[in-house]
Amino acid sequence: MPIKLDNVSYTYAPGTTLAVQALRGVSLEIGDGEFVGVMGCTGSGKSTLIQLIAGLIAPTQGSVLLDGEDINAKKYDRDALHRKVGLVFQYPEYQLFETTVERDVAFGLRHSGLSREETAAAVKAALELVGFDYDAVRDKSPLGFSGGEKRRIAIAGVLASKPRVLILDEPVAGLDPLGRQDFLNMVDALNKDGITIIMISHNADALAEHARRIIVLRDGALFRDGSAKEIFSDYFDLIHNGIGVPQVRRAAQLLRDRGVDMPGNIILYSQFIDRLKILMWRKNK
């Protein structure tokens, strides 16, 4: 389900003294099954971008197309849009409120027209997608789980409607290292199942490890668009513009600055360790 933004701009409070242009002339396409990371400083337009893709707001200028159709056209089926595109805001676990996991995950399906059996099947499938045993957790309170588990339950509530696109806003914020890795592995699995992932994150390490394409916004405009290796290899330009880079890329650059034979395109821990092994082997020859 290709997503296309054609010369999209968005202004908050247009025509007033409080007007702020959040996006300006953004054009891009996201293909079926992609895993796209979105980066940028605070105020760069990231949250506005994903709200436009999800159809929560309409562009001031330009168009947003899904499968070639303008999602803001009067005749466009908005209910179908919200089934196709799932949006998970930051800290979604704070929105858990039902008495059981099953009821919470099923909440968004109340007006879907599904029978009780169909709803139960959708809830079961969604919970299994995020790594839960349906029978083991269905009757438990969602509030009794760990932070990472609560977040997975909240995402199951979005997945229950079987979206083809999943948008995640800072999904690993506040998680401990183990919870963060488990969560990202789950997102990888969803992507392998064919779900298009669009993930906003300030965590450059997470994007380097998992996103196959990264979009960088600056001052509401498209600043960079490429593979993780392409984006993070341009170390000094990113740092100059206040955009984060993976910690391992920083470490590699520190060694390069001290004369160590360290390539400038290392962005993964595995690459860094492999290079250190080579350097140690050379030293001990």
Language model segments and positions:
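The feature captures the beta-strand-to-loop junction immediately N-terminal to the Walker
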Residues: 39-41
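Helix-to-loop junction immediately C-terminal to a conserved catalytic motif
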Residues: 54
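ABC ATPase NBD Q-loop/coupling interface
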Residues: 63-80
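Conserved ABC ATPase signature
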Residues: 141-145, 149
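Conserved catalytic motifs of ABC-family nucleotide-binding domains
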Residues: 162
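Catalytic Walker B motif of ABC-type/P-loop ATPase nucleotide-binding domains
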Residues: 166-169
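Conserved ABC ATPase "signature" C-loop
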Residues: 219-220
